[in-house]
Curated annotation (Swiss-Prot):
Name the UniProt record assigns to this protein: S-adenosylmethionine:tRNA ribosyltransferase-isomerase
Pfam families with a match to the protein in the record: Queuosine_synth (PF02547)
Top-level taxonomic group: Bacteria
Function according to Swiss-Prot or TrEMBL: Transfers and isomerizes the ribose moiety from AdoMet to the 7-aminomethyl group of 7-deazaguanine (preQ1-tRNA) to give epoxyqueuosine (oQ-tRNA).
Family membership noted in the UniProt record: Belongs to the QueA family.
Enzymatic reactions: 7-aminomethyl-7-carbaguanosine(34) in tRNA + S-adenosyl-L-methionine = epoxyqueuosine(34) in tRNA + adenine + L-methionine + 2 H(+)
Annotated gene: queA
Organism field: Maricaulis maris (strain MCS10)
Location(s), subcellular: Cytoplasm
Length: 353
């Protein structure tokens, strides 16, 4: 399909710079399986779901992956000190990360970047688009602790361009379920949930389980090809525990609905599906790319936020509910002044029949 088929005009005023307060006060557009949509709120979830429905949450935790450092003056080859912005996006091993850096052109293989007094990293690989491999002078838990001190919360670029990171983001950009550190962006659909909403869902008889996908910075990269067949999806690490697989498989076997919360939870369970209605426990890197015509082995409904024009995430929701339906639903959301993107409002999408 042509990438331009997934385009739409989004006024900048629709981009949310702060979350709703409280979190579950956000609005929610419900899109039924027949394409009919209705204006609701996140707090309406217990009324829209059924006893026995299984919600699947991503329990990844965002790390403070935005770092500012200095490349010292070179003793050989010239060049004074250079300020460097580093956004970690994928862990390679205990001491190495891949990162997007600026200005990448001012860095060479073997250059050292200093982040404060003690944390340092050496450039050991360079790729296109400012993507470099960094090896730090710490490893494992010690490196995690050093990054936590030196780094800032990595807000999406469309928010960071409009305002700086502040202390509110440290709490606002983590979900209620955040447990396993490793993401450089939040699984944003999970940001809408509060203890009160979870209690109401439990009282309704809605069940829950958790999976993990560590969100990479590639989630913000634009699609540069003209045709979806030519796009190479970024890969991210994900895992489904035996407990989660058992819960999902039991729900499917009993005819109960499985509802991932967020595209990351959906991509995880679909990546580890071994057949219709069956997901296997395990871990893997996934580059699954879902577009109209793709099959869904597990997902019956999806709760997600509103996404960028021509993004892989808008392609995913179009695959689930239909491109024509999503174009109409998004046009309605824009006209009705829904709030878009990471800190914005939500959609509850039923798989198209």
């Amino acid at each position: 399909m042509r990438v331009s088929d997934f385009d739409f005009h989004l006024p900048e005023a629709r981009i949310a710079l702060r979350p709703a307060r409280p979190r579950d006060a956000a609005r929610m557009l419900h899109v039924a399986s027949n394409g009919v949509f209705a204006d609701r709120g996140v707090r309406d979830l217990p009324d829209l779901l059924q006893p026995g429905d299984l919600m699947v949450f991503n329990d990844t935790r965002v790390i403070p992956a935005a770092l500012k450092g200095i490349r010292p003056a070179r003793a050989v080859g010239g060049g004074g000190p250079v300020e460097v912005e580093v956004n970690l996006h994928k862990r390679i091993d205990a001491s190495a990360w891949r990162a997007f850096v600026r200005p990448a052109k001012r860095l060479r293989m073997g250059d050292e970047i200093a982040f404060g007094e003690t944390l340092k990293a050496e450039v050991t690989g360079k790729s296109e688009g400012g993507d470099v491999r960094l090896v730090f002078n710490a490893a494992g838990a010690a490196l995690d602790a050093a990054i936590a001190v030196a780094g800032e919360m990595p807000l999406p670029p469309y928010i960071a361009r409009k305002r700086g990171v502040d202390e509110k983001d440290e709490a606002d950009y983590q979900t209620l379920f955040a447990t396993h550190e490793g993401s450089v962006a939040a699984p944003t659909a999970g940001l809408h949930f509060t203890p009160e909403l979870m209690a109401a869902l439990e009282a309704r008889g809605v069940e829950q389980t958790r999976v993990t996908l560590h969100v990479g910075a590639g989630t913000f990269l634009p699609v540069k090809s003209d045709d979806t067949d030519d796009h190479q999806m970024h890969s991210e690490w994900c895992t489904v525990s035996a407990e989660a697989a058992d819960a999902i498989n039991a729900a499917k076997a009993e005819g109960r609905r499985v509802i991932p919360v967020g595209t990351t939870a959906l991509r995880t369970i679909e990546s580890l599906a071994s057949g219709p209605g069956i997901v296997r426990a395990g871990s893997r890197d996934t580059d699954i790319f879902l577009t109209p015509g793709s099959d869904f082995a597990i997902t019956d409904m999806l709760m997600t936020n509103f996404h960028l024009p021509k993004s892989t995430l808008f392609m995913l929701v179009s695959a689930l509910s239909g491109l024509d339906v999503m174009q109409r639903a998004y046009a309605h959301a824009i006209a009705a002044e829904y709030r878009f993107y990471s800190y914005g409002d939500a959609c509850l999408l039923e798989r198209r029949t």
